[in-house]
């Protein structure tokens, strides 16, 4: 596990006293300890998080349920979920960090990215990031998991995805 030189971890430089700030990488549940409604275990390696962060499935609470994606964290792509405002100019720090991650893996010779739940990330990010990756790695494919047929075109034409998939029909057959 070697981080590329000059790349900062997510959260470095964040203001954890702000639920939302355009250049924070995370959404913080300020002044609250992560306290799920189920046991995460105990002992010397018990998990502790302060302040709590929003989960990957948009649970903006320090008290997620076992059905929330408590093992993931919601990245801040510049959307203030408190009022719905979007802050994409200047480009948010998370966008730069994510495109660095995409380029890192592309440099390892992978042939595609399967991007889960893409509709939970602004299409504007994908429309910015995918062309940047394809500048140097034009062969690489981007495959999007998406379920709302009403936004398929947006993710193809504005998000620049090569393929979309909806696995609901796979599970429901």
Feature locations, PLM:
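Core domains of carbohydrate- and sulfate-ester-processing enzymes
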Residues: 2-81
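Aromatic/hydrophobic pocket-lining residues that form the small-molecule binding cavity
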Residues: 91, 95-98, 126
């Amino acid at each position: 596990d070697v981080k590329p030189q000059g790349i900062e971890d997510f959260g470095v430089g964040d203001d954890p006293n702000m639920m939302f700030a355009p250049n924070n990488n995370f959404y913080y549940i300020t002044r609250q300890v992560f306290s799920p409604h189920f046991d995460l275990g105990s002992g010397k390696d018990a998990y502790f998080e302060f302040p709590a962060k929003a989960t990957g499935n948009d649970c903006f609470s320090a008290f997620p349920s076992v059905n929330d994606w408590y093992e993931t964290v919601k990245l801040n792509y510049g959307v203030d979920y408190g009022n719905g405002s979007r802050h994409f100019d200047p480009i948010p720090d998370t966008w730069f960090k994510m495109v660095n991650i995409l380029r890192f893996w592309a440099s390892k010779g992978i042939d595609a990215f399967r991007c889960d739940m893409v509709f939970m990330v602004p299409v504007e990010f994908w429309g910015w990031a995918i062309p940047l990756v394809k500048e140097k790695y034009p062969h690489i494919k981007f495959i999007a998991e998406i379920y709302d047929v009403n936004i398929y075109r947006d993710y193809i034409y504005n998000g620049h995805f090569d393929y979309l998939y909806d696995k609901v029909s796979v599970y429901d057959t």
